[in-house]
Amino acid sequence: LDDAQTALTGFGQGQVTATPLQIAMVSAGIANDGVVMNPQMVDAVIGNDLSVIRASENTEFGRAVDAEIADEITSAMVASVSNGAAQGARIDGVDVAGKTGTAENGNRPHTLWFTGFAPADDPAVAVAVVVENGGGQGQSGSGDTIAAPIAKKVIEAVLGR
């Protein structure tokens, strides 16, 4: 990468490619004091008598950042939801940590993102939402107005709110 491409990559543009699962892993790693875990799609396999046939084990993928850095990122993400660019994910009584993204696609509709976790001080859920084709709003939609409210609904469902 040249200097310009490196700069674009630094804020998520250019040649950055990531799946929603990978972005959810980023948020989960921040929520987990900088330690990224391997993703699991199944918590346990249950038999027809409701006994656990096989339970999944949590395994560490690796440390992405020091705990102190993860804490600083968490604070910035909470501020983004509380009074910044990600207010579409605000939930009364819950500190949500989040980050929006609006990827430009030339003259085509934007790709809208939100990733985050909650509660920020004792995380129970990490989420990533991607909405393609501008969520029906062309180039006027944003991660805050389209993707963040979807994430809010998911977080509320997980937290039973």
Where would I find each of the regions flagged by the language model?
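Active-site beta-strand/loop architecture of penicillin-binding DD-peptidases
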Residues: 1-60, 77-161
